[in-house]
Regions:
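Conserved core of the sugar-phosphate nucleotidyltransferase
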Residues: 1-42, 56
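Left-handed beta-helix
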Residues: 24-32, 47-254
Length: 254
């Protein structure tokens, strides 16, 4: 009842470990919630933390520091009933972001009593010409020309060409705007510009920052491949990932 932690297991794997950690009653508002999960946020008295770091030879908080603290000190949990997700895998990261662009997102950025502020960038507002956006989140500084965006997240400085289509995808954007001279130089090397090329179709994918997707590219994973490594891309948990600074030439199909 006091919220004191008397046992802790980092990433329990077996039924026996889970059974040992089940609480006799729900700690929050959900009657079916019978476990406490660590969010990885810890508050220490400075002197206590110093003593632990000196006395424990290992340095992993979850595996070593916290278990030692529980053995010898009073450790208490602050129960949090709000939105929290572990996004340590490609699939979890993808699902969490795509859910934000749904009609009923799990987390709301725009609550008047608790708005979320991002880092100030002083970028111009996004410009969209002849676009159709349905359930989309579009960050600042983008230029989107006659594109169709459905349940997708579009990051800062994204350049999306004419007639491109995004479905259930995450486009991380870019760290910079490409100058005309740089675009010409890359074109001479048959390298597409930063952004999503005209006529490209992207479905259930994550496009990392500064990626170059050429004209008429199709990223769809129609075969439903779960795990694969390709040239300029990889697939994890069925999600196609274009890595940072990746290049997908025009006409390529994934």
């Amino acid at each position: 009842d006091e919220g004191r932690i008397v046992a802790f297991c980092e990433k329990p794997q077996t039924d026996e470990e889970l059974d040992a950690l089940e609480l006799p009653s729900a700690p929050g508002d959900d009657p079916d919630a019978r476990y406490l999960a660590s969010m990885g946020i810890y508050i220490f008295e400075p002197s206590v933390l110093t003593s632990l770091l000196v006395s424990v030879p290992e340095d992993d908080f979850g595996k070593h520091i916290i278990p030692r603290a529980i053995e010898s000190l009073n450790v208490f949990a602050h129960t949090f009933d709000g939105y929290w997700e572990d996004i340590g895998t490609i699939g979890a990261f993808y699902r969490s972001n795509i859910t934000l662009a749904s009609t009923q997102p799990s987390f709301e950025f725009h609550k008047p009593e608790a708005p979320i502020f991002t880092r100030q960038r002083n970028l111009a507002a996004t410009r969209m010409l002849g676009c159709r956006v349905d359930r989309g989140i579009v960050a600042e500084g983008c230029v989107i020309d006659d594109a169709q965006i459905e349940q997708s997240v579009v990051g800062v400085r994204s350049i999306i060409g004419a007639s491109a289509r995004l479905y259930q995808s995450i486009v991380m954007g870019a760290d910079y705007y490409e100058s005309p001279a740089d675009r010409e130089r890359h074109a001479a090397l048959h390298v597409p510009p930063v952004g999503i090329g005209p006529g490209s179709v992207i479905h259930r994918a994550i496009v990392d920052k500064n990626a170059r997707i050429g004209t008429d590219v199709v990223i769809r994973n129609e075969a439903g491949v779960m795990e694969a490594d390709g040239e300029g891309y990889y697939i994890r948990e069925g999600i196609v990932v274009i890595p940072k600074d990746g290049v997908i030439p025009g006409g390529m199909r994934i």
